[in-house]
From Swiss-Prot:
Tissue: Red blood cells.
Protein name, entry field: Hemoglobin subunit beta-1
Organism: Pagothenia borchgrevinki (Bald rockcod)
Something else known: This fish has five hemoglobins: Hb C, Hb O, Hb 1, Hb 2 and Hb 3. Hb 0 presents the strongest Bohr effect while Hb 1 presents the weakest Bohr effect.
Family note: Belongs to the globin family.
Keywords on record: Heme, Iron, Metal-binding, Oxygen transport, Transport
Annotated heme b binding sites: H64, H93
Superkingdom per UniProt: Eukaryota
Purpose: Involved in oxygen transport from gills to the various peripheral tissues.
């Protein structure tokens, strides 16, 4: 079980209360698909993903990026039981979708990068530490079914 300080809980809650899902989600998933092109294989039904421009302009990518960020809300609401919160999603991604669990970490890194770019200097080391801890716990929970 992960121990959360009151400060970490406050930081994570504050990030999500100000998060522009419609901006950060599409940018983060687009970045992941562009920087790590092998991740595109899981999105073959999304249409044209042949280059950066087509990925950035793809409505399916944007919608899924938003969905992913809203999926993080579940973890935020259940910070003391993140593993159980994502158990069904872990099973789906491992048994049906066959997503490489390393891809969760890649996407988490892209979310962090996009959020940092958006927040600028306000994205302090303390904020980054709490946010990345939260994402690491979610990534671990999503990968549980693979072990």
């Amino acid at each position: 079980m992960v121990e959360w300080t009151d400060k970490e809980r406050s930081i994570i809650s504050d990030i999500f209360s100000h998060l522009d899902y419609e901006d950060i989600g599409p940018k983060a998933l687009s970045r992941c698909l562009i920087v790590y092109p092998w991740t595109q294989r899981h999105f073959s039904g999304f249409g044209n993903l042949y280059n950066a421009e087509s990925i950035i302009g793809n409505a399916n990518v944007a919608a899924h990026g938003i969905k992913v960020l809203h999926g993080l809300d579940r973890g935020l609401k259940n910070m003391d039981n993140i593993e159980a919160t994502y158990a069904d999603l872990s099973t789906l991604h491992s048994e049906k979708l066959h997503v490489d669990p390393d891809n969760f970490k890649l996407l988490a890194d892209c979310i962090t990068i996009v959020l940092a770019a958006k927040m600028g200097q306000a994205f302090t080391a303390e904020i980054q530490g709490a946010f990345q801890k939260f994402l690491a716990v979610v990534v671990s929970a999503l990968g549980k079914q693979y072990h």
